[in-house]
From Swiss-Prot:
Highest taxon, organism lineage: Bacteria
Protein residues bound to a divalent metal cation: D26, H28, H61
Site entry (Transition state stabilizer), positions: H53, T149
Listed pathway(s): Isoprenoid biosynthesis; isopentenyl diphosphate biosynthesis via DXP pathway; isopentenyl diphosphate from 1-deoxy-D-xylulose 5-phosphate: step 4/6
Protein's UniProt name: 2-C-methyl-D-erythritol 2,4-cyclodiphosphate synthase
Protein's organism: Streptomyces avermitilis (strain ATCC 31267 / DSM 46492 / JCM 5070 / NBRC 14893 / NCIMB 12804 / NRRL 8165 / MA-4680)
This enzyme's EC code(s): 4.6.1.12
Binding, 4-CDP-2-C-methyl-D-erythritol 2-phosphate: D26, I27, H28, H53, S54, D75, L76, G77, F155, R158
Function, in words: Involved in the biosynthesis of isopentenyl diphosphate (IPP) and dimethylallyl diphosphate (DMAPP), two major building blocks of isoprenoid compounds. Catalyzes the conversion of 4-diphosphocytidyl-2-C-methyl-D-erythritol 2-phosphate (CDP-ME2P) to 2-C-methyl-D-erythritol 2,4-cyclodiphosphate (ME-CPP) with a corresponding release of cytidine 5-monophosphate (CMP).
Cofactor (UniProt): a divalent metal cation
Similarity field: Belongs to the IspF family.
Assembly and interaction partners: Homotrimer.
Amino acid sequence: MASEASDVRLPPGGPVVLPLVGIGTDIHAFEDGRELWCAGLKWEGEGPGLAGHSDADVVAHAACNALFSAAGLGDLGQHFGTGRPEWSGASGVTLLTEAARIVRAAGFTIGNVAVQVVGPRPKIGKRRDEAQKILSDAVGAPVSVSGATTDGLGFPGRDEGLMAVATALVVRAG
């Protein structure tokens, strides 16, 4: 019995170019004395910032991880880890811009990125359009941002930190 895959017919002129999908996550604990950066934006009056080697922007970092995952290019730590002092204190937008450059240099076109930040604050909806513009400009492709809470469960529910989960779609160029 033939498998369904063997019944697939390729269009004349060559193979179908399939998109590649990656997933990325990032988690940081809150730390007093730091500014809160999330989704490329500084959130004044939203409490302590996030601990990290860079600005600890979980949304930008998860987006980087998703792009690297989709392209098979490792992860955030490989490219911008704590062993790389030149990235110390870097903004998430700077890292995301560089991640997109690396992915394109490896021969990929970026389709889009979607990111969800998980935690009770900041309230992403208040500045969603602003965040999406900044992140889309950094990637050079559409980036959507959403927020979710955990109904008091886990470390985000206890207001100990933030988590973000992202997906990215890329296609091999040419």
